[in-house]
Curated annotation (Swiss-Prot):
Protein name: Maturase K
Species of the source: Pseudotsuga menziesii
Protein purpose: Usually encoded in the trnK tRNA gene intron. Probably assists in splicing its own and other chloroplast group II introns.
Single GO biological process annotation from the record: RNA splicing
Main location: plastid
Subcellular location: Plastid, Chloroplast
GO cellular component assignments: chloroplast
GO MF annotation list: RNA binding
Length: 515
């Protein structure tokens, strides 16, 4: 495989016939077995995997022999379980074959994606989800509309095969992939839609298929959006004098209408910006309401006609940033209008201009998060802390570590918001719930627990907040300002509470369209 990685860019013969023989190499499944034991090949934690599942290379060799004799993959999934691919704990053999198939398909995909990234320097992947927020902070204030789209997980098997056929010319491999996809479709419960539905099937194989499909869409969509921009200069919308100049030039009538529009257009920033995380894609647009409707219509037609992907109406929402808040990534996203006074002195005269600029202002949904904490039994519906009874069987260190981890994740994730006063209300709920849990475990009161543990109780738990009050994060006065932002670069996914709240918001929107 390393040789294919080295020579893939120079020689395209690897697309012809190398994939299919690799499917039947026992060493490939030995690689998967090592990853399976280490827990690195699956996106699920190892505690969700049954310990009774035993991997048998003899069974894998027999399955490979059956494939060689019968020339199709049906025998991979019969005579095992009635629904072998849906239940991971009952089908380690089928899972191993799917993981081996994924390892093979990832070789040309990684080569192709690497070459694409080398050709487009601006399109880079980041580990942290917070890499999205600096982009939003830079582009959102200069946009007046936002289109939030939820990409569906349901994809027809034949569409996936066609996307692979564009860059793999190995026909046996495509036939094997088609057999696997259709066999999974036939074994699933929903036979009427004839679609692969993978939000709950969190395996490496289906995640790879969905990511590859989205990559195919974006590899065509993103260059089109960049090409639609008439200006290739650096962003200048944040300069007050440029913003004021753009407003005044619209009233100049000494040029003809056609030339004036061309000059004004050449001075504007690119008016369409695209960003995606997971299943959510956000497009920020600067223009009129008619332009937004046209852009939304053309994007839907592009995805439906070119990739045969149907979007339900509730999956596409458009908002005007100056009037409405958009819920995304666990935040309320809005643009806060901020007045700005600019004084310009020319010779002996002083000119004063009053400008209004937009500022990206993500809001923490405090009340919904408290409601989720109440659902998890940390407090009641009014926000009053209660003891976590299910944790009383743990040790004191485990209880403190769990509460500490919950608070640290919440505080780190929402550290980029301006108003962080509500976060300290969540800290109060978690800290008092921690004390009540320890008191309930030892059958005493909060005062006794605090007296026995002393200052170590809350020094050990919730201590990570001190990192933000020390250099280099602190200001000169020794405390962080409420207008300072810190986007952490070590957050790989959405906070669980924020993710739960986002799903509730999406469900509310879906119910509104159903009514």
């Amino acid at each position: 495989m390393d040789e294919f990685h080295r020579n893939g860019k120079e020689d395209s013969s690897w697309q012809q016939c190398f994939l299919y023989p690799l499917f039947f190499q026992e060493d490939l499944y030995a690689i998967y077995h090592d990853h399976y034991l280490d827990g690195s090949s699956s996106s699920e934690p190892m505690e969700h995997v049954s310990s009774n599942d035993q991997f048998s290379f003899l069974t894998v060799k027999r399955l490979i022999g059956q494939i060689r004799q019968q020339n199709h993959s049906i025998f991979l999934f019969v005579n095992r379980d009635p629904n072998p691919l849906v239940d991971r704990n009952k089908s380690s053999y089928s899972e191993s074959v799917l993981e081996g198939l994924t390892l093979v398909l990832e070789v040309p995909f990684s080569i192709r994606s690497k070459n694409s990234v080398e050709g487009i320097n601006e399109w880079k992947s980041f580990r942290s989800i917070h890499s999205i927020f600096p982009f939003l902070e830079d582009k959102f204030p200069h946009s007046n509309y936002i289109s939030d789209t939820r990409i569906p997980y349901s994809i027809h098997p034949e569409i996936l095969v066609r996307t692979f056929r564009r860059w793999i010319r190995d026909a046996p491999s495509l036939h094997l992939l088609r057999s696997v996809l259709y066999e999974y479709r036939n074994s699933s419960e929903n036979l009427q839609r004839s679609l692969i539905v993978a939000p709950r099937v969190n395996t490496r194989f289906f995640l790879f298929l969905w990511n590859h499909y989205v990559y195919e869409c974006e590899s065509i969509l993103v260059p089109l959006l960049k090409r639609s921009s008439h200006s290739r200069s650096l962003s200048h919308g944040s300069f007050p004098e440029r913003t004021h100049f753009n407003r005044k030039i619209k009233h100049i009538l000494i040029f003809s209408r056609r030339n004036s529009l061309k000059r004004i257009w050449s001075l504007k920033d690119p008016n369409i910006h695209y960003v995606r995380y997971g299943e959510r894609s956000i497009i920020a647009i600067k223009g009129t309401h008619l332009l937004v409707k046209k852009c939304r219509y053309h994007l839907l037609i592009f995805r439906q006609c070119y990739f045969h992907l149907w979007f339900e109406p509730y999956r596409v929402c458009s908002h005007q940033l100056s009037k409405n808040c958009s819920s995304s990534l666990g935040y309320f996203l809005r643009i806060r209008m901020k007045p700005l006074l600019v004084r310009t002195k020319m010779l002996d005269e002083l000119f004063i201009a009053d400008l209004i600029t937009g500022e990206f202002d993500p809001i923490v949904p405090i009340i919904p998060i408290i409601g989720l904490l109440a659902r998890e039994k940390f407090c009641d519906i009014s926000g009053r802390p209660i003891s976590k009874l299910s944790w009383t069987s743990l040790t004191d260190d485990d209880i403190l570590d769990r509460f500490d981890r919950i608070w640290r994740n919440i505080f780190h994730y929402y550290s980029g918001s301006f108003g962080r006063d509500g976060l300290y209300r969540i800290k109060y709920i978690l800290s008092l719930s921690c004390a009540k849990t320890l008191a309930c475990k030892h059958k005493s009161t909060i005062r006794v627990v605090r007296k026995e543990l002393g200052p170590e109780l809350f020094k050990k738990s919730f201590s990570k907040e001190r990192e933000f009050d020390s250099p280099p994060f602190s200001s000169k006065s020794g405390a962080r300002s409420q207008r300072e932002r810190i986007w952490h670069s070590d957050i790989p996914q959405i906070n669980p509470l924020a993710n739960s709240w986002q799903k509730i918001q999406d469900l509310k929107v879906e119910n509104l369209f159903d009514q």
